[in-house]
Amino acid sequence: MELTTRTIAARKHIALVSHDHCKKSLLAWVMENRDLLAQHELYATGTTGNLVQKATGIDVHCLLSGPMGGDQEVGALISEKKIDILIFFWDPLNAVPHDPDVKALLRLATVWNIPVATNRSTADFLIGSTLFSSEVTIAIPDYDRYMQQRLDLK
C-alpha cells in the first residue's frame, strides 16, 4: 500500500483503555501523569473513562464500555484519524469475551501507525518522549490512492 503523511499536533488525542485486572494500574499511571495528560484531549472506553474522570477531575470523552462496543468505537476513531495515541493496559493472562475486538483495535492502531503503550513500561517510555508534547509527522496508508486503485476497473 502507498503511504502518505499525517501531522499530529502537539496537543494529542489520547485513548485510554484497560481490562478489568489492569484498571488500578492504569489509574495509578494516570494519577502520576495527571498534569501532563490534562494538557491533551482524552478519550476512553466507558468504565475506564469514568474512573479516570472521578479520580483526576480531567474531562474525558467516555465511549461505550469495551465489551459493549467501546473498543470498536476507539478503533473507528483511530481509522478516522481522530486518535493520536493509544494507551491500552490489557491483560494477556485472562481471556475476555470481546478478544476479537481487542485484536481488531490493536490491528487498527498498527495499520494507522499510531503509538501504542500496552503496559506501564511502554506508557512511561511514550509519555517521557520529547515527541509526546510536540508536533510530529507520521506515515499512514494513503486511503485515497487505495480507493482510487480499487475503483479503477480497467
From Swiss-Prot:
Keyword Cell wall biogenesis/degradation: no
This protein's UniProt keywords: Lyase
Gene3D superfamilies: Methylglyoxal synthase-like domain (3.40.50.1380)
Binding site residues for substrate: H19, K23, T45, G46, T47, T48, S65, G66, H98
EC number per UniProt: 4.2.3.3
GO MF: methylglyoxal synthase activity
GO cellular component: cytosol
Domain of life: Bacteria
One GO biological process term: methylglyoxal biosynthetic process
Annotated TM spans: none
Catalytic activity from the UniProt record: dihydroxyacetone phosphate = methylglyoxal + phosphate
Catalytic residues (UniProt): D71 (proton donor/acceptor)
Presence of the UniProt keyword Lyase in the record: yes
Domain MGS-like: 1-154
Protein family membership: Belongs to the methylglyoxal synthase family.
Biological role stated in the UniProt entry: Catalyzes the formation of methylglyoxal from dihydroxyacetone phosphate.
PANTHER family xrefs: METHYLGLYOXAL SYNTHASE
HAMAP family on file: Methylglyoxal_synth (MF_00549)
Protein name: Methylglyoxal synthase
Naturally occurring in which organism (per UniProt): Yersinia pestis
Lineage: Bacteria, Pseudomonadati, Pseudomonadota, Gammaproteobacteria, Enterobacterales
